[in-house]
Amino acid sequence: AYGYGKSPVIVTHKELEEDLKNKSIDPSSLKVVVMIQCVDSREKDQKNYCSRICCSSTLKHALHLKSSNPDITIYIFYRDMMTYGFIETYYTKARQKGITFIQYDFENKPDVTLEDSNVIVTGFEPIIGAPIEIKADLLVLATGVLPSLPKDPADYFGIQTDGLGFFEEAESKWRPVDALKE
């Protein structure tokens, strides 16, 4: 999706984190970065759930890039910004630092094209009510989380999984990291 795999300037958040860690991306060399949320997530046919960590990861990376390079322009295309707990403060800080948030809906997803070594992201900006075009040095995609534990170990340890293959939590609000088995 969104040209992933066709250009080295289109990466996932996991790849961005690795590139920042091993210094293969220098934030000071970037002028414009676009981040797109809910890539292949919250769709009718695939990953029809919110992974609950993508927005936090996006905000963390956007703030890191902005602190490393205050002159960088960052746009975040999002469907719904889902931050939990203290991470909500990251959202507030990001807006205060000048990071631009552009909401999109399922029917009007951003479009991505490649031009030379840049990425062109077009979308509809609901506040101004018009299409926009952004020429970016880097496009970062927030992809959903997939369950990775095979069913056999879950059965062996007696841990229940939900219909999607994730461990079933004891109580999503108060005990989200506790399994049903005590």
Q: Model features per residue range: what roles?
A:
Residues A1-E182:
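Residues forming the flavin
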